[in-house]
Amino acid sequence: NKDWAHMWIQEGIGTYAEALAHYELGGQAAYDRIISAHRRGIKYKKPMVGGEELSEDETYAMTDIYTKGSFFMHSLRFLLGDEIFFPTLKKLATDSAYTYDNFVTSKDVEQLFSKSANKDLKPFFDFYLRTTDVIDFTIKEVGYQQYQIRINNFFMPLPVEISTSKGKEKMIVGKEGIRIQSSFPPLVDPNGYYLKKVTLLP
């Protein structure tokens, strides 16, 4: 990576690789335990990318480059799907354009994944890397067994798993939100693919 400001690329992805190794050894449950531990370890004190020309000490004082860096890759994997995520991650790790002979920035990683996904991922990268925010979901009952789900601080269309009385389904939640039918309040992202808070409004 180019300088200390982008150390999450090395440290975060390396930490995520540990979760993948646990999956190979112990299956999905082992992977989930590691990812949950990484999520619990996030401090949310400073953005992972805090500016150019950071010192080594300043960078490594931000432990989120490990934990949040790993969870960011977990979220990105869900957002893109394995069929896009893993070939792109392999390219990042093996293509000479991104290896140690070159200076790689967060922007380079963003553009690589955006190209593979054929979509602009800048809002997603900015949210995870350059803020300490979590995705703010609200759920409001708007009629008999009718619920409105909105995202209040992130406006890129986002695939989200939602559990209702009919089962679990992946839906795209855009800036207008979505309305769903359920006999009980829906569960948003029950498997924890995103850093989030969920509020059930009165």
Where are these regions (language model features)?
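Zinc-dependent metallopeptidase catalytic helix centered on the HExxH motif
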Residues: N1-D32
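Amphipathic alpha-helical substructures
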Residues: A5, M62-Y147
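Short, surface-exposed loop or secondary-structure junction motifs
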Residues: D32-I42
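Active-site-adjacent bridging/hinge elements
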Residues: R40-E53
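Catalytic-site signature segments of enzymes, centered on catalytic residues
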Residues: G50-Y66
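Glycine/proline-rich low-complexity spacer/linker segments in large multi-domain proteins
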Residues: Y194-P202
